[in-house]
Regions:
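Residues at secondary-structure transition points
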Residues: 6, 10, 34, 55-58, ...
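A generic structural signal for alpha->beta connector loops
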Residues: 23, 49-51, 89, 126-129
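Rossmann-fold NAD(P)-binding glycine/threonine-rich loop
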Residues: 91, 96-130
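Short, hinge-like loop/turn segments at secondary-structure boundaries
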Residues: 44-48, 109-111
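Rossmann-like NAD(P)-binding element
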Residues: 46-91, 98-104
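Active-site phosphate/pyrophosphate- and oxyanion-stabilizing loops and adjacent acidic/basic residues
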Residues: 41, 81, 118-121
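NAD(P)+-binding Rossmann beta1-loop-alpha1 motif at the extreme N-terminus of oxidoreductases
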Residues: 1-45
Length: 130
């Protein structure tokens, strides 16, 4: 099972769709069950033979053998800290990009730990972050 934490945005749904089309069962997680369910139904419509479910982030993290993190950078650390137990021993693919969108422009953000992946590994010492 492949899970997407914060999977209701364009990146999470797009990745979930590609894996679903390839025959992988996926779970789309969100802080809001309704949004997760809606995103799963949207992916299911595009991949009708696929196994696609929506759930709250903790359940998605628990169920995934491979877990993608697709949240905005502003919520990255807090999201991971809240899922530390569920992500223990898991392979975590962190797709988060440290950028802000301000006044119609993107701005790169400095990550104190050096990179988003390094931050994730420090927050999730018992997970394998890639």
């Amino acid at each position: 099972m492949i899970s997407f934490i914060g999977g209701t945005g364009p990146e999470g749904k797009g990745l979930a769709l590609r894996f679903a089309l390839a025959g992988e069962p996926v779970v789309i997680g969100s802080r809001d069950l309704g949004r997760a369910t809606d995103a799963a139904l949207e992916v299911q419509r595009l991949a009708p033979k696929a196994s696609v479910e929506g759930s709250l982030n903790p359940e998605a993290a628990e169920r995934g053998d491979l877990v993608f993190i697709t949240v905005p950078f502003s919520g990255h650390r807090d999201t991971l800290e809240g899922l530390r137990e569920q992500l223990r021993g898991k392979i975590v693919v962190d797709t988060v990009v440290p950028i802000a969108f301000e006044e119609r422009r993107f701005r790169a953000l400095v990550v104190e730990e050096g990179s988003v992946a390094e931050q994730a590994q420090l927050v999730l010492p018992e997970s394998r972050v890639v």
